[in-house]
């Protein structure tokens, strides 16, 4: 890949968007493999807790959790790609997007057992670092539980009904 000609240690990750799964002609996993060069491909999926508060595409928190799980299910397990969830709480003050939404989202995806992590956006882009400490406080409070979930559920298979959604419908 071209990135290797600049620096073979540079790692490029892909942030998914909705259209990449259906009508862009290439999905995030394929793009990540193409751009990774000699490094491990990295994908941050799309679907964030702030969607629930804003009712983006009329989604509630449980819909967004299942959207990310569906996107993760499209990854071929033979592919060695690091996959992160989008833990965005834009625009970040708790009165807009409760910290509980971020923690519930993180908890559910850890219990899924197939994510390599979550990119938690816990700081406001423009405000003082003391402006909104609750996201970080809740994250720290839940650390022991998060670690236990990762150990207890990591690598296990979900059972039950799986609604099949085709990739690349257009």
Give the positions of each predicted feature.
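Hydrophobic targeting/anchoring helices
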Residues: 11-170
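Active-site groove signature of glycoside hydrolases
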Residues: 1
């Amino acid at each position: 890949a071209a990135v290797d000609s600049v620096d073979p240690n540079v790692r490029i990750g892909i942030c998914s968007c909705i259209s990449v799964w259906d009508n862009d002609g290439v999905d995030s996993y394929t793009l990540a493999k193409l751009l990774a060069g000699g490094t491990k491909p990295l994908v941050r999926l799309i679907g964030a807790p702030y969607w629930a508060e804003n009712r983006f595409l009329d989604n509630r928190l449980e819909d967004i959790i299942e959207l990310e799980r569906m996107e993760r299910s499209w990854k071929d397990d033979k592919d060695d790609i690091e996959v992160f969830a989008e833990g965005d709480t834009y625009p970040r003050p708790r009165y807009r997007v409760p910290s509980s939404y971020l923690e519930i989202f993180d908890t559910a995806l850890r219990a899924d057992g197939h994510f390599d992590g979550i990119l938690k956006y816990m700081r406001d882009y423009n405000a003082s670092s003391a402006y909104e400490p609750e996201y970080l406080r809740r994250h720290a409070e839940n650390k022991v539980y998060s670690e236990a979930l990762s150990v207890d559920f990591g690598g296990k298979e979900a059972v039950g009904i799986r609604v099949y959604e085709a990739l690349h419908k257009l």
